Amino acid sequence: MVIGTYISIITLSVSGLNAPTKRHRWAEWIQKQDPYICFLQVTHFRPRDTYRLKVRGWKNIFHANGNQKKAGVAILISDKMDFKIKTITRDKGNYIVIKGSIQEEDITVANIYAPNIGAPQYISKC
């Protein structure tokens, strides 16, 4: 699909998506908003829980999670966009960076959930 001049992006701090009702309502809301890219922070997923995050029309879902139900970030890229992934860099729940291309134009998308204290120093280390 050819996209226009703009790419719509939504970013949300979801404060956990382990509850099925919250997850389903969130998925319905995202489908109605219809962005190209969605960033989620504070998903509270563990690596073994990521299969729970499903949205119709969004097969490209990338996570960074720790072993405890805290922090966690995700990047969702809509199927309506021809995004080609080159590299993915992530840690244990605070950031994920995806380098790729859209219509042969390089793009980098990053989702960072920094601690409340020392955020500038944390981000400079990423």
Indicate where each model-derived feature is located.
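A shared catalytic/ligand-binding motif for oxyanion handling
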Residues: M1-C126
